């Protein structure tokens, strides 16, 4: 049973680590900048678990423990391999103008971005996954299950409902899940990889951003996700054809704009901002 469950995988965070393996972290709530290890950040105890409530103690503490953690782990090897390939290609000047991902890799990349968004505790809280919707216990099928569990002296019907809600949200293998639908939506957009030479991108405890501030047109879709201090991923429906699935060089002065987007969001959504170098955070927060 995994107690400390990461919502940002360590293979991703390590891309933003300094030479000593530490990540510079700005805690917006405390107003402090400090260095820490990737294994100690972006995690919560039993984040993806559902506790049995009003249930037979023989069932244990959690409903199907570690199921989501195991599913994430199955894909993270594939995600990590692709991410390192992208970083390697984008870092090589010889690949300027080259196509970065093939069809299967585009699918994997969209799955990864969706996973990063949906498994985040803020996203899960917005979806009320740990709440039983009013009236759902009156649904005939739920009543039948509840009666059966009571007869078997198991109980815990509401816990099963909560677990099912998480599966619909997180499970890529569940037909019609949010993970499936989000991946499909991203595949319907064009992507490009923006690169910076000297200034650095930051990332955060909520790295995937949908839409960029009030200047973004309502009909324009933009998804921003930093992959590395010098490489970020953009999805959109208005990207120029010449950068589709290719590298686009970002003017250095525009990097501050992207980094500041995290600082504009509420602290409960983005409490921590991460960077490879302390000076990048100091400039951002001053």
Ranges and model annotations:
Residues 1-4, 8-286:
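Alpha-helical structural context detector biased toward long hydrophobic helices
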